[in-house]
Amino acid sequence: MNTATLSTVSTVSAPSHTTSSALHRACVAAKVAADNKGRDILVLDMRSCTPLYDYFVISTGSSRRQIHTVAEESDAAMRAEGDTRMGIEGYEASKWVVQDYGDVVVHVFDPDTRDYYKLEELWSDAPRVDWEREI
């Protein structure tokens, strides 16, 4: 291994702010969906199902505008909790918006797409979190 290469490698410092727990942030995202009239809101505890993420937040919006609002307001709430979105998919099409926060993934569906993919059935082994009680 070339030691010159090693000396040019830089490290990224951890953020100076403190993020709240993944469970708390997932519940905050669920509450934001509810506050913006999202329907059929679920928080799934994914820790026993996959090592990739801890929680899924799943909700349904009835229109493109509502789907965008839930996604945008969820992102603002996650930022307020000290989190940074790592990626987003599906915003333009507005059928299924996926926001990746590393340990929390927020899914906002239109009704037909949610019915087609049935994530809660696909991940039926994941325990459901009583997010309203947790908040």
How would you name each of these model-derived features?
Residues 80-88:
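Active-site phosphate-binding and catalytic loops of NTP-dependent enzymes
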Residues 53-55:
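Short amphipathic alpha-helical segments
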Residues 1-48, 64-72, 76, 89-91, ...:
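Long, contiguous binding/interaction regions
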Residues 99-101:
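Active-site beta-strand termini and strand-to-loop segments that position acidic
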Residues 58-61:
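Short hydrophobic/aromatic beta-strand micro-patches
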